[in-house]
């Protein structure tokens, strides 16, 4: 009986070691130095943890990544208060690097700043994202997850592109799908061609259609 139990535990351990890792190893920092002191700052610690979980625990692709192949990325969300309850504007800085084969070095693949951030977040709010229904029930709340899902796909796309021409197209198309179905209204910007020449629309459009 003990022998059977030991064999079972060994097989379970071997199986767990073979499970595919998620694609991203993301660190998220939520900077609230420009948020009003009247706001409960503990909510942003909760948000930071929720965003890390959202990026790292979700399976973004059907590909298999070994633990040492995960894409290292840092996202800094800089927020400031608005006149609306639980609504914030600001920017996000996205940096990512991939491991260099057979070395301990990382090769940078993304360094980008997005100044078109407008989100709604209430502490302990569930971060829900459905790529078939990007807009969700509340545009501003959905804009938060749409924003991070978009950059998750862009990061994965640039990683794949670094290995082969057009290697990231499938993921850039996922990002473009978010653009095409993004939340709108409530002063949300960055998803439309007319929102400026440097935004999420043009980033996806240019990488897919100008090569």
Model-derived segments and their meaning:
Residues 85-123:
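Signal peptide-directed extracytoplasmic domains
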Residues 1-24:
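Bacterial Sec-dependent N-terminal signal peptides
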Residues 21-32, 42, 140-148, 158-159, ...:
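Structured catalytic/translocation cores of nucleotide/phosphate-coupled proteins
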Residues 29, 76-78, 93-95, 120, ...:
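Residues in well-ordered beta-strands of folded domains
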Residues 22-89, 100-102:
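Start-of-domain marker
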Residues 108-180:
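Internal, conserved structured core segments that host functional sites
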Residues 156, 163-211:
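Flexible, glycine-rich surface segments
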């Amino acid at each position: 009986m003990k022998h059977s139990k030991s064999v079972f535990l060994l097989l379970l351990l071997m199986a767990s070691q073979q499970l595919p890792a998620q694609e991203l190893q993301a660190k998220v920092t939520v900077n609230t130095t420009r948020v009003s002191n009247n706001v409960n700052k503990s909510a942003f610690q909760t948000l930071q943890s929720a965003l890390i979980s959202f990026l790292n625990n979700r399976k973004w692709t059907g590909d298999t990544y070994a633990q040492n192949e995960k894409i290292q990325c840092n996202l800094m969300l800089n927020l400031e208060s608005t006149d609306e309850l639980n609504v914030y504007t600001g920017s996000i800085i996205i940096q990512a690097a991939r491991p260099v084969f057979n070395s301990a070095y990382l090769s940078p693949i993304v360094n980008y700043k997005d100044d078109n951030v407008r989100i709604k977040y209430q502490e302990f709010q569930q971060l829900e994202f459905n790529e078939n229904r990007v807009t969700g029930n509340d545009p501003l709340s959905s804009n938060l997850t749409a924003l991070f899902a978009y950059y998750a796909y862009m990061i994965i796309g640039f990683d794949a592109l670094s290995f082969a021409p057009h290697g990231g197209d499938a993921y850039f198309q996922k990002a473009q799908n978010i653009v095409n179905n993004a939340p709108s209204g409530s002063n949300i910007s960055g998803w439309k061609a007319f929102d400026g020449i440097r935004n999420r629309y043009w980033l996806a459009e240019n990488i897919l259609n100008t090569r």
